[in-house]
Amino acid sequence: MKTKVEIKHWITGSILFEFECDGNSILKTLLEAVRLKKDLQGADLRGAYLRGADLRGADLQGADLQGADLQ
């Protein structure tokens, strides 16, 4: 079943990027946004499981990563 995940701005709540696929997760959505070189400044990634994610080239300036698993 396809699931849509949205990455929102942590202050305004506006949608920065959304992605829909089978077995979707915040990690898959974030990696797709990075692959497409989307602007993720201010992204709300609090508590996200991002272990092992290759975020090179991602623009996460001002993103909220509080409690995110980045190791």
Regions of interest found by a model, annotated:
Residues 1-71:
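Extended, small-residue-rich solenoid/repeat segments and analogous flexible loops
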